UniProtKB/Swiss-Prot annotation:
This is Bacteriocin carnobacteriocin BM1. Belongs to the bacteriocin class IIA/YGNGV family. Pfam families: Bacteriocin_II. Has antibacterial activity against Listeria and Enterococcus. It comes from Carnobacterium maltaromaticum (Carnobacterium piscicola). It comes from the Bacteria. The keyword Disulfide bond applies. Residues 1-18 form a propeptide. Keywords: Antibiotic, Antimicrobial, Bacteriocin, Disulfide bond, Secreted. Gene3D superfamilies: 1.20.5.130.
Length: 61
């Protein structure tokens, strides 16, 4: 080995068989991209709830 780097937890979570995780259920490697539907659904739900909560907070002004 020429060099070794200790990975932190976030970096370890992004390793998926040489693919890059974009944190929303989308993964890409050199050949293709794909979606993990369970992760994607959770990410979209979080975005929707966050937007809904922000709009409610803004209604009080």
């Amino acid at each position: 080995m020429k060099s070794v780097k200790e990975l932190n937890k976030k970096e370890m979570q992004q390793i998926n068989g040489g693919a890059i995780s974009y944190g929303n259920g989308v993964y890409c490697n050199k050949e293709k991209c794909w979606v993990n539907k369970a992760e994607n659904k959770q990410a979209i739900t979080g975005i929707v709830i966050g937007g809904w909560a922000s709009s409610l907070a803004g209604m009080g002004h």
